[in-house]
């Protein structure tokens, strides 16, 4: 608190302490404490009681009461009298003093602002306002549309949801753009409480300018009926194109693709080309890449029915497959690897499907957003609890029982692509508790050739961002340089979903036109899997070898994949306040649980020995700083669990 200056250093120091704690834990109260701290620091008046602080910006009953409790504790500890609660007269005097202090202004008038020429309003492409105007342009001059119908018509034109907030901790949706349109008098509102909407004359003028801005000559009315969502993805933010719905399960789906993909090679850029005759289409986003997916339209307009839009649900869990693959013996060299005849799946006998983890959600109150948006883009996800990763792709046999007859389980084969999606706040949390390192380690042990990390932008406190920026940059660099994984950065969850859909279409192009070779499950063990896969890739780099989904689930099951080191670290992290970073440092000193128990045992069980046990971990890690350091309280807690107190 010594560094806190101002007229109220005691109160200022406590608020600063709470602000620092809120920033450290990335809580929502951090901006509130920051506002209160800056307000109190700038105030020249001295306050006697915390309740008087409510005349300042940022101070409410909660902070004032917390300061009162802290002041009471401070007075009791130091033998000081507790200040009395101020009277109303004192509060009025403070308000007058603050008003007088804020009324002092520079007598010199500010320089006159230069007049700006107002530009004609044209909403941003694919914004909420753009989508609403496009949907309303389908109406005739005297027709109106209710909110439910309007949202359904407008959603295909917008890259943001009209019902779900763009950011999990914000309330803004694309529908909030309606307020802007009403303020600019571009939309008529009729009827209460059942509201109906229509374009004003000015609204029609804006639609006309939108048309001119896109260099299109076709009329506005009815244009949305010939449009659909297409998939777009690039190195930066991309805009969705519009075309007709394409059902990937149809034999003649209208999907034209350039067959220039190299096998097992995931390229970061996937672009979309729209037909030139389609009216009111946004210009497609093109990426600097020779790889592209061209999605064109049929003469007809195929539509998904409601059943096609629903995700595929699988009830079988990975726990059912834990004992499927045996542990086996170690493999000292290639001569100990098994010889086998691979199972061959002919082209056309399977379809490529996206598997989405059931825990992968946008927000707790909207758990189905990702699968619903994928379904709108023509990708029916298979919903399943995944032990590893958030998204992966499988080849699903069209003929049930085919794999069983040939020596593998189930009807699904895991392809060599897996995705780990992390928002910035989740990335920071996983770095702090050690999950980030553990996940990368388990991905490496999975044998997957193509690992993609999607790092999704998120609105976090700027102080938290600055505090962990170096850690985030280091983590993202290690993903690419150290581990050799592909890193995809997106700005919104909508962009992440479009990217996943684009990858799905690309993998369909890569795999569905060639045979798949599957390793029989009976030759696999947990010890020979990685050496076998490595040997096959070196021996036949042009041919991929895959395993069934049940075998993969058994191999990556957390209970089978964890080493003694992993188990020990997880055991340590069960202790309250013991983070992943601290657990890793403890494991570096005592390699196994046995060594830690023996270290406590060596301290002795008498009174002097118990004192040594309480400070054992703290003394051994005293050279560490910051978050890796173990204080006395945590050291005693560890001794309570592992020692002989």
Curated annotation (Swiss-Prot):
Places the protein is found: Nucleus
Keywords linked to the UniProt accession: DNA damage, DNA recombination, DNA repair, Endonuclease, Hydrolase, Magnesium, Meiosis, Metal-binding, Nuclease, Nucleus
Superkingdom in the source lineage: Eukaryota
Primary localisation category: nucleus
GO BP terms in the entry: DNA catabolic process; double-strand break repair via break-induced replication; mitotic DNA replication checkpoint signaling; mitotic intra-S DNA damage checkpoint signaling; replication fork processing; resolution of meiotic recombination intermediates
Composition skew (Acidic residues), residue ranges: 296-305
Domain annotation ERCC4: ranges: 353-459
InterPro entries given in the database record: DNA_pol_lamdba_lyase_dom_sf, EME1/EME2_C, ERCC4_domain, Mus81, Restrct_endonuc-II-like, WH-like_DNA-bd_sf, WH_MUS81, XPF_nuclease_Mus81
Compositionally skewed regions (Polar residues) per UniProt: 223-252
Cofactor(s) required for function per UniProt: Mg(2+)
Leader sequence residues: none
EC number: 3.1.22.-
Region of interest called Disordered, as start-end residue ranges on this chain: 98-119, 219-310
GO molecular function annotation: 3'-flap endonuclease activity; crossover junction DNA endonuclease activity; DNA binding; metal ion binding
A GO cellular component annotation in the UniProt record: nucleus
PANTHER family, per database record: CLASS II CROSSOVER JUNCTION ENDONUCLEASE MUS81, CROSSOVER JUNCTION ENDONUCLEASE MUS81
UniProt family annotation: Belongs to the XPF family.
Oligomer and partners: Interacts with eme-1.
Task of the protein: Interacts with eme-1 to form a DNA structure-specific endonuclease with substrate preference for branched DNA structures with a 5'-end at the branch nick. Typical substrates include 3'-flap structures, D-loops, replication forks and nicked Holliday junctions. May be required in mitosis for the processing of stalled or collapsed replication fork intermediates. May be required in meiosis for the repair of meiosis-specific double strand breaks subsequent to single-end invasion (SEI).
Protein name per Swiss-Prot or TrEMBL: Crossover junction endonuclease mus-81
Annotated source species: Neurospora crassa (strain ATCC 24698 / 74-OR23-1A / CBS 708.71 / DSM 1257 / FGSC 987)
Gene name tied to this protein: mus-81
